[in-house]
């Protein structure tokens, strides 16, 4: 993930400024912004401060002929960048430097940038849908929608940008749509969709096929696992079966449908010497030839997008508190955070969490340089 490759892809982003007004190169402004965010910057002034503190370092990678741009210039330029071109560069960069395994599970999930709404301009908060390689903990693509409800139309657009051949694509119930299933199959991938009330007939078929007695004593391929932590004990039972004859009609509606899958969670909460038992049942459909154990691994991997991406964005990078909203800036800044997470995640030399890596990058130029040049990265 060398910086040189990234900047090569970024160089195709068009700069719409009038040439005679350009005091700072677009590539320099983006280079500064990316380095600053890797080092913990959360806003425009933070980025300017980073630049003023590290001018000699930045000149090793960019021109900065007229010095470091002020925060107003950074904000104005970044907010005018085409999000479509930026996302294209991001995806091409990831394709160039990251080879995904055919066994990878790609989790597609959305996240609302809570403070990106602009009341004065009557603009709602934006919703960013990310494609996350659970095997490598890397963001491999992203696209913006104006509302969560628009995920249904945005997911196919995101899939168009990705190479998903041989991969399993997971989504929540919002993404459980026949058109999306067909698209994934046409692109050579497999799907694993959560099923809820938005697919009424399918959900009812599951309830009839898997009554409580079946869940307690499954007749199909099953796999159980248990976990104890924080005064809580959880047993997860996973059941997988072929589509039975009485439900064969669903295979004509859902392209490639092979398996019906059920995940049952029995959770015991130990409080004041009493055990409270909770049971949760979740249904899934899949075109992949899954065993119960592989199904358990796939849905567990799907939740990596929450704790290895969304949690990091909110807790470590304070994304939910970010009030950047000028022009296209909120969407662009979200993408730059993804770049920073990918670069730092791939550093295998310094064994530490994201927050500590960001602090080290801010304090240690040698470490920042090693991260940017890709030395020691897998």
From Swiss-Prot:
Check the record and name the Pfam families matching this protein.
DDE_Tnp_1 (PF01609), DDE_Tnp_1_assoc (PF13808)
GO process annotations (BP): DNA transposition
Q: Which PANTHER family match?
A: H REPEAT-ASSOCIATED PREDICTED TRANSPOSASE (PTHR30298), PROTEIN YBFL-RELATED (PTHR30298:SF0)
Q: Which GO terms describe its molecular function?
A: DNA binding; transposase activity
Q: What family name appears in the similarity comment?
A: Belongs to the transposase 11 family.
Q: What is the protein name for this chain?
A: H repeat-associated putative transposase YdcC
Which organism is this protein's natural source? Escherichia coli (strain K12)
**Top-level taxonomic group:** Bacteria
């Amino acid at each position: 993930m060398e910086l040189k490759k990234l900047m090569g892809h970024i160089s195709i982003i068009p700069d719409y400024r009038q040439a005679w007004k350009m005091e700072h190169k677009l590539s320099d402004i983006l280079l500064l912004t990316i380095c600053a965010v890797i080092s913990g910057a959360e806003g425009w002034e933070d980025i300017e401060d980073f630049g003023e503190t590290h001018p000699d370092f930045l000149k090793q990678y960019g021109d900065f002929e007229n010095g470091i741009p002020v925060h107003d210039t950074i904000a104005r330029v970044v907010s005018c960048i085409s999000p479509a071109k930026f996302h294209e560069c991001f995806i091409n960069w990831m394709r160039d430097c990251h080879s995904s395994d055919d066994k990878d599970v790609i989790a597609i999930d959305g996240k609302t940038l809570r403070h990106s709404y602009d009341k004065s301009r009557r603009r709602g908060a934006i919703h960013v849908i990310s494609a996350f390689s659970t095997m490598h903990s890397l963001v491999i693509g992203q696209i913006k929608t104006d509302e969560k409800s628009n995920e249904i139309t945005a997911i196919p657009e995101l899939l168009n940008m990705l190479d998903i051949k041989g991969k399993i694509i997971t989504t929540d119930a919002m993404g459980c749509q026949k058109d999306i299933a067909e698209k994934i199959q046409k692109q050579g991938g497999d799907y694993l969709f959560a099923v809820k009330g938005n697919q009424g007939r399918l959900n009812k078929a599951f309830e009839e096929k898997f009554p409580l007695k079946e869940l307690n004593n499954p007749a199909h391929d099953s796999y159980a696992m248990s976990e104890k932590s924080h005064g809580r004990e959880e047993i997860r039972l996973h059941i997988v079966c072929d589509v039975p004859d009485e439900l064969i009609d669903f295979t004509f509606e859902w392209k490639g449908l092979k398996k019906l899958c059920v995940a049952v969670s029995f959770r015991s909460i130990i409080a004041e010497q009493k055990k409270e038992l909770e049971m949760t049942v979740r249904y899934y459909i899949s075109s992949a030839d899954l065993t119960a154990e592989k199904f358990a691994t796939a849905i567990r991997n799907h939740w990596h997008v929450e704790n290895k991406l969304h949690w990091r964005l909110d807790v470590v990078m304070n994304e939910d508190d970010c009030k950047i909203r000028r022009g296209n800036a909120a969407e662009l800044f979200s993408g730059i955070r993804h770049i920073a997470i990918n670069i730092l995640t791939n550093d295998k030399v310094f064994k530490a969490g994201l927050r500590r890596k960001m602090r080290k990058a801010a304090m240690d130029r040698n470490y920042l340089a090693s991260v940017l040049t890709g030395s020691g990265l897998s």
